[in-house]
């Protein structure tokens, strides 16, 4: 009777394992598709700043005539 709690550990372990597998698969799929890990807390402001930075770098790299 002292190992009754062990009966609940198997389903709990399966559920926890599946949650870990789902989280890791999302990470690796996103990394494979975008080429970099997902940014945590990445909002519209960060996206706008990335676009601005990309334009500035392209403008600086373009040959001036």
Curated annotation (Swiss-Prot):
Main location: mitochondrion
Keywords for this protein: Electron transport, Membrane, Mitochondrion, Mitochondrion inner membrane, Respiratory chain, Transmembrane, Transmembrane helix, Transport
Transmembrane segments: 3-23
Subcellular location: Mitochondrion inner membrane
Recorded topology in the membrane: Single-pass membrane protein
GO cellular component: mitochondrial inner membrane; mitochondrion
Subunit structure: Complex I is composed of at least 49 different subunits.
Family: Belongs to the complex I NDUFA1 subunit family.
Protein purpose: Accessory subunit of the mitochondrial membrane respiratory chain NADH dehydrogenase (Complex I), that is believed not to be involved in catalysis. Complex I functions in the transfer of electrons from NADH to the respiratory chain. The immediate electron acceptor for the enzyme is believed to be ubiquinone.
Name of protein: NADH dehydrogenase [ubiquinone] 1 alpha subcomplex subunit 1
Annotated source species: Arabidopsis thaliana (Mouse-ear cress)
